[in-house]
Amino acid sequence: MILANAFCIVLFVDETLRSLAAPPSPPGQDLQGWRVPVDCIRANKLCAAEGSCSSRYRTLRQCLAGRDRNTMLANKECQAALEVLQESPLYDCRCKRGMRKEIQCLQVYWSIHLGLAEGEEFYEASPYEPITSRLSDIFRLASIFSGMDPATNSKSNHCLDAAKACNLNDNCKRLRSGYISTCSKEISATEHCSRRKCHKALRQFFDNVPSEYTYRLLFCSCKDQACAEPRRQTIVPFCSYEDKEKPNCLDLRNVCRADHLCRSRLADFHANCQASFQSLTSCPGDNYQACLGSYTGLIGFDMTPNYVDASTTSITISPWCSCKGSGNLEEECEKFLRDFTENPCLRNAIQAFGNGTDVNLSPKNPSPPITMLPKVEKSPALPDDINDSNTMYDTSIITTCTSIQEHGQKLNKSKEQSLCYSETQLTTDTMPDQKTFVDQKAAGSRHRAARILPAVPIVLLKLLL
């Protein structure tokens, strides 16, 4: 009898341990990547192929189509549709700037996220995939294409050099000549240009010409007005930027947000250029490139920004608007405007590009970094089938990492960079802008299984005795 009971207990414990130690099933409803971020065009197709998602998505679109959107969204059926769709691929989908069917992709994105927002938010999440490239990549390509670095020869007119470099590239020359011609074409005695056509031509230029050329035209470093004024004139501001009167900034924001494309570019600008005083550069993720890319993405829309003057001592950027007539919303308006005019992230990013510098960063929350050559005699033994690749280090990188630790993080003004990563960071966080979804429950289950295993023989021994 005792042996029979012991046998039953063994079977029970074995089954329990199997269930605890087994890997978790993928999140979501099936294995089609429901919780894996995909572009919104693909997400829309996945949703259409699943009956429940498809019907709820149609319901939500009807809820958002009415004039009184907030009242409709308060409806129980609309709320139920939103809850279901938050578990669908539509919730995590993103778009890519300049992608084919970009407008269609953004329409899908906002059809979900406008329903989730409670009224108008001051800052909205960006619908675009995060930018992972750095300014150093732009510098390298610029030197390859033009034969010189963006900031070489301090006595030269960098903006003139940028125009020359553009003229040497057929695509850049063609699209630049196209928008200058369109924006300078007089329509009538009362209408000196077509702003709509001018904006469209500008968007074609900045969306289709590589940043190696467009950045040099927009952000060239200037020491005199002979350079700074052509830089200000890059976007033909008398047509694309200036107007007879300055509208209220909040009114201009409302006009922009009425268009999915303009709304997306504005949200992306705030996401990548919003001043962060907890970072070295004042930029989110210390990424100058992401901020400058978002800035250029706004050109060619109602919210087009530009230099307010040809000053060489300070950089001031602003859309063509003011806060006059804001009434009770003056504080909100001033805050919105300061994100352009007094933005340390944007200013630092422009200056960094003009100077040909980028920031060299170590991880924000690193494991103990590698700062000295490993001592072989103290290294733990590894299995025979595993190569000890960590024992081979570049001494120049180690010296750089040590220097950063001793003297604090500084802007890297050299052409070549060496990033300081810990062993854990090198294997698990090589792309900091992308998130990895980890099931915390699964990890806990494996730990519990490890704790239970040693106790099994003791239980069996007591039963047998």
UniProtKB/Swiss-Prot annotation:
Subcellular location: Cell membrane
Keyword annotations: Cell membrane, Disulfide bond, Glycoprotein, GPI-anchor, Lipoprotein, Membrane, Receptor, Signal
Subunit structure: Interacts with NRTN ligand and RET: forms a 2:2:2 ternary complex composed of NRTN ligand, GFRA2 and RET receptor.
Main location (coarse class): membrane
Disulfide-bonded cysteines: C40-C93, C47-C53, C63-C78, C95-C105, C159-C220, C166-C172, C183-C198, C193-C239, C222-C227, C249-C321, C256-C262, C273-C291, C283-C345, C323-C333
An annotated Gene Ontology molecular function: glial cell-derived neurotrophic factor receptor activity
Lipid-substituted positions (GPI-anchor amidated serine): S445
Protein name in UniProt: GDNF family receptor alpha-2
Topology class, membrane: Lipid-anchor; GPI-anchor
Alphabetical list of InterPro entries matching this protein: GDNF/GAS1 (IPR016017), GDNF_alpha (IPR037193), GDNF_rcpt (IPR003438), GDNF_rcpt_a2 (IPR003504), Glial_neurotroph_fac_rcpt_a1/2 (IPR017372)
Glycosylation sites: N355, N387, N412
Protein family according to the UniProt entry: Belongs to the GDNFR family.
Biological process, per Gene Ontology: glial cell-derived neurotrophic factor receptor signaling pathway; nervous system development
Transmembrane annotation, as ranges: none
Superkingdom to which the source organism belongs: Eukaryota
Propeptide feature ranges: 446-465
GO cellular component terms given for this protein: external side of plasma membrane; receptor complex
Role of this protein: Receptor for neurturin (NRTN), a growth factor that supports the survival of sympathetic neurons. NRTN-binding leads to autophosphorylation and activation of the RET receptor.
Signal peptide: 1-21
